[in-house]
Amino acid sequence: MGLKKRVSFDWLLKIGIILVLAFLGLFGIIFGSYKLLNDSRLGVVFNGSTTTTVYFLNHKSKDANKELDPTQKKDGNGSGNNTEMITDVNGFLNNIEKSYANSLYAQGFSSVNITKNSHDTSAKELSDKGVFDSSWLVNDGLPSISVTFEQRREEARTRARKRQIDAQVKRNALSAIEHNYKLSLETTDGIVLFDSFDKEFIRNSLTAVVPQTTNTNSALTFEYKLSKNVITKESLHNDFLDFIKSKSLTDSDYNTGNGQKSVEGSGKWFKDKANGSAQNGNKTLVLWKDKEGAVQYVRNIFNVPKGGTDYLTFNEREKNLWDFLHAEGNFSSGDNLFLQKNNNGNSPITKASDITLKNIYYIYAAPTHFSQVATKDNNNKDAADVVAVANSADTRKLRSGDATGFSGLFSNYILAEIRTEDPVAKNGDPVKVNATLQSFLDSNNQRLEHGGNIKFQVANFVNNDGSYVPASYLEASRVKVLLSNGFPETATIAAANTKLVNAPLSNTLARDVSNFASSFIALGVIILLATIALGIRYKLLGLYKALALALSAISSLAFFSAVGGVVDVFSFVGIFFVVAVNIINLITLAELFLRNIKNNASIVESWKLCLKRSFFTMIETHICWLLSALVVIYLSNYQVQQLGTLMAVSAITSYFLNYGLGVILVWLFVSSHSGLEWRFFLYKKDAQALTKTSSNYSILTENNDIQTDFFISKNQHDFFGKKKWSLLFIWLTVLAFGVVMLGLYLGAPQLLGNFLAADIESSTGIMLGVGVISLLYLLYSLPRYGVAYGISYLIALILLAAGLFGAMYLANFIFRIDQSTIQLIIFVYLFWLFFQARIGQTTIWTYCYWFKRSLKDRVFVKNLFNDNVNSQWRLDLIGSSVLILLFIVYAAFNFGGINGTINLVIFYLIAIVALFSVFVNGLPLFSFGLINGWLSPYNYVQIHITLRHKKQMFKEVDQIEEQLISGINSF
């Protein structure tokens, strides 16, 4: 065994490359981990769920310019009726479902699940409480959407604090749900110039501008089609001003009064002339992104009783808003910016319905009045009050604009404010366009690409302190997603109600360690345990593989985060499956290497055969993985789409890093002189085969000789015995069950339970991703591996369907946990990926190793397949247990409830993974190789096989002789 040690350039080069790759791998692991732990786009990891039921009016307005108000009595059925029924309620709810699925992701929420009810009678309870007028009820019910999601939640150490946190979580959920994103350009008193439902608005023109290399700023652009056919660069602004004039704004605050005339005077919000005595209006337009949401948010703040649990959850800004609305605290004085009290000394706002779409802007700010001319003369007696408006912030004076001012809350609802005109030198002079309108309608940026004839640009967004800041690409993209996924035009929220679903999870390490950090630590522990196990079992080979495994896992998460993915519970569940698949692939290659060694192959030859027998199968597996992920990305929404993105990234990193880097490292070392030293790879008992010589063998003619002499290592189980044929009946029964379950899912999925993801499209995306790629692989396998293999795969796939849907049904029946935290349809996709990877592993271990050569030489198939099953059961056992062990480690770091209680969600997760593992790793995979043998075209029931008694020279390592060596198929 001894080898002469010598240093050569080849040795130095290969060892040097190994060290460089290992260093780069370690650097990638450390740097990737650092980036992840400091990433701002971290989602929530099992941190508590809320369910919010939103009730919608099943009426719509006949006039597109008039909104329905659920707090007011519905119009009667006479000629003055302005409402009509929504006929397709289910289609209406489907559109809202899709809107929530995408917009909540853009807001940063995790684990969203959505259910619909076309006639929810629980709406009557809210109507009886006066939340909305009962005249809107239809048969004592309304259509509703129930949305469950997770959000960040801090720890509560006292019972009182827990109540406050519960209230805060519920209120945050309500605020998030009651958004109705719609782009709307309006006057300050609510007259709509156009909105995103206008037929002339080019909806698909919403674009987040990619920053130039010399500038990091972005912008939001969109196109509109004015009635004028030709708009030139020179006439651009005047044409838009003509468009404004066509809207009949004579009595609007835009043209008349002091800028807020509509809310001033006796019995109104502000005292007369609180905004000055100018008479030319304010010439200000407001670009809203969610005006209805702003109204609902302010109404909710107003309705909270002072000193109650909800009030205690207010931040300083919200407390200031509450004080302003009730004319209390610092807002009780007679300041012109504050509300004027009525005769009883109370706020003029007496009920939430007083806050409307027409007056909501004036809670936010007092518009700067407009002066016709810029100098004081006989034509402009108020010219001394002229205020220069150089930017959007100058268009108004915030009601509360300090560091804790409530006006900053409106940054969630207002995009921009635009002053259209500047004062002229004297009456009669041409209109002078304000700088904010010039920015909004940039004459140098009128490249029209979507069918409009005018292009608007918002380069600065309202910040959370009320100031204006340049738009970042991330924020512009987020706003674009929100506006592109608004409610249908006919949607009006009547009411909403929120409840907590389950106690949130905390970590088990320390109070100051976040849920994400503890989950990431769990991932690190998993990789460490895998490294130790691989290193002990496979020595240097295992350490190389462990490095590739760690780099692949961290790179998958890091790249996923870099492309905009939110690292949350779905990401960790997905990455654990990726790690499990990669571990199985590594173990398969390592065991195949040892198998070749035991078969009298040299170390170099053994590794060559490993590559030869695994290369194309690995490509096939990862291509299926990647293509299915792309289908899911294209057809799904929200976190299911994100999971598809993670799987697509992982397919690439797993092949090139987990498989590719591991192969390169081992090959470089094996091909060096040091690699010829067996002690780096093998224990003494495994290395004994390196000194054995091939024995003389022959294939005898008698069946008894074949059974007694050829297969010296007796099979522990005979799966083809007469008594075992009863198993065929069981398999056929399960096969029929799989067909039935598939039929039920396609025809009546509600009978199987609530297995859908956040929305129907996502569930459809998963099923198409699984079904289409499985069919393509089946068609591919027929010419590559033969009909027997293809039929075996098809049967195993149907058995898998029985297992997956059966596991979903049992999990739903046994645990009945909230689907928001664990969506079972997600596990259908993940376990299909796991199944597909195991098919590849089985193909490497059996078909590529045994079938081709053995069947070619007409080996007795009965004994061959018995030996296959007996040789693979340990790999099957490892494959079945790896996932369960991974989630047990995950649970060890994430089982403690914030309030000192144990949350069972994480243990349900372990049980569900175990349940799915049994169904996926049991019958489908077990039967795959066995059925392949049954369907073999060779007659294995004949009594005698006639072959020549001669020694055959094979071009590669003999795959039959290994059965002469005791213990070759064990490890």
UniProtKB/Swiss-Prot annotation:
Membrane topology qualifier: Multi-pass membrane protein
Predominant cellular place of this UniProt entry's protein: membrane
Membrane-spanning parts: 11-31, 516-536, 547-567, 569-589, 615-635, 651-671, 727-747, 763-783, 795-815, 817-837, 878-898, 900-920, 923-943
Keywords of this entry: Cell membrane, Membrane, Transmembrane, Transmembrane helix
Domain of life, per lineage: Bacteria
Location in the cell: Cell membrane
GO CC terms, sorted: plasma membrane
Protein name per Swiss-Prot or TrEMBL: Uncharacterized protein MG277 homolog
UniProt source species: Mycoplasma pneumoniae (strain ATCC 29342 / M129 / Subtype 1) (Mycoplasmoides pneumoniae)
Lineage summary: Bacteria, Bacillati, Mycoplasmatota, Mycoplasmoidales, Mycoplasmoidaceae
